[in-house]
A protein has these predicted regions:
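Active-site neighborhoods and metal-handling regions in enzymes and metal-associated proteins
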Residues: 1-140
Length: 140
């Protein structure tokens, strides 16, 4: 189960990345991620999202990892935009709770396993560049 959720998180992230190119709506990334995750009988956490990277570490735009029904209202990708794609995928439901003890630790509401993967993406003239790709990931 743990390996499955890790693979679904990674594979959904990569499918989202492969969608990146100038001229598409940002929401199209979330749609492809969410569709894949649901096809694997998993869910995408809705309380957290990817984000823009620039002068401030976490900035707009928010990168939603599911179809929120507002794709046409989402930003259109342009060369030079930099953001993260980082789906959090659960084996159970999408709801999460934050610890009352430390105010930081997050668990799934139904206590199911969860996994997250993340890359930082640069929109190029013809597609994308993965800025955080490690050498050992090149052949995966």
């Amino acid at each position: 189960k743990a390996l499955k959720i890790c693979n679904v998180a990674r594979d959904s992230m990569m499918l989202g990345i492969e969608k990146v190119k100038p001229g598409i709506h940002l929401g199209e990334i979330g749609k492809v991620i969410g569709t894949y995750v649901h096809s694997k009988n998993c869910s995408v956490v809705r309380d957290y999202c990817g984000h823009g990277i620039g002068e401030v570490f976490h900035e707009l735009p928010q990168v939603i990892h599911y179809d929120d029904g507002k794709i046409s209202q989402s930003p259109i990708l342009e060369p030079g935009m930099t953001f993260t794609i980082e789906p959090m995928v659960n084996l159970g439901g999408y709801e999460v709770i934050t610890s009352r003890i430390d105010g930081w630790t997050v668990t799934t509401k139904d206590r199911s396993l969860s996994a997250q993967t993340e890359h930082t993406i640069l929109v190029t003239e013809n597609g994308y560049e993965i800025l955080t790709l490690r050498d050992e990931e090149l052949n995966q």
